[in-house]
Amino acid sequence: MYFGHIAIYTEHLTAMTDFYCRYFGGTVFYEGVYGDQKSVYIAFDQDCYLELMDKASVGPSPLSPGEERQGLTHIAINAESTARVNELTARLEKDGYPVVWQPTDYGTDRFYESCVLDPDGNRVEICVHEKVLRAERGLG
């Protein structure tokens, strides 16, 4: 089994679409209108996709941008290397996106990641998969 898609309601459909396509290599493969809801589907390298939805009857979140809470707390996107995590984090920061934490090494072969906020204030972790990290460090 694997995740099919993640769906996010947004008041900033264009900005969110641009963010996930420009910085994470997504490609819009479908746009539709269903009553008062507009949806944009963004495909990535694997079978998982992101559905962004703008619906007038869904109000804004009462949470502050980046605020942690029970329930879904972040999206993690795997980068191909630690260098890519560093480069993308620096680019996002330069372009004005809030960085929750800079690239951080959580141990020799476990985690290397940063965290930024998307235009809606959702946390997005930019990670290196454990297998890639181990290979970069010659740990097999």
Predicted regions, residues:
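Core segments of cupin and vicinal oxygen chelate
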Residues: 8-50, 54-57
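Short, flexible active-site-adjacent loop segments at beta-strand->alpha-helix junctions, enriched
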Residues: 7, 56, 81, 120, ...
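Vicinal oxygen chelate
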Residues: 89-140
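A short, acidic/glycine-rich surface segment
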Residues: 37, 57-63, 133-135
